[in-house]
């Protein structure tokens, strides 16, 4: 990303959305120690912040200031950048990061954007998708394919630190009787191509 302020905003947004959607906060105390959400009082306090953020009653910066926290943006590593095909009525411009999950924090989905969760290795998540047990779009699929090459979090982080991240603009391609999201060169994820369902008119 060419503009520093835009780049920093993407990193901050990644940390904020992880907290808002699953309750995982990548942040440090002023002394450099990681924030913990371990005790009953800590869970109650940070759950309250999270509810206020999701309701629009508080800004993320206000929570950080109140708790005197700093964001270790250097612990998020830029991994991939995806843009939806131009013909689609709903488009996204999304960036994926890799990071080690903070210790002493329990993942709790927000019940709105995320209604359930489970921990899976990347290869296991792809297998669940291929069996039709979970849904994914192409950016999720291909990012998991890429990240499944690594045996550990440390390997993924090291690779991301050295990585050049181009923007990938996907396409819609007609395959059989389905519209499928494919890579820019037209190749599809053959094991189970992600079918795009157009919104119904009227």
Ranges and model annotations:
Residues 62-69, 73-82, 91-104, 109-134:
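NUDIX/MutT-family hydrolases
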Residues 34-35, 88, 106-107:
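Short catalytic/ligand-binding loop motif for oxyanion handling, primarily in non-cytosolic enzymes
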Residues 30-31, 81, 140:
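Short, well-ordered beta-to-alpha junction loops that form the rim of enzyme active sites
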Residues 1-72, 97:
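The catalytic Nudix box helix
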Residues 2-10, 48, 85, 89, ...:
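Conserved aromatic-histidine-acidic binding/catalytic patches
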Residues 138-202:
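Core RNA-modification/binding signature centered on pseudouridine synthases
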Residues 43-44, 57, 117-153, 157-162:
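Internal, well-folded beta-alpha domain core
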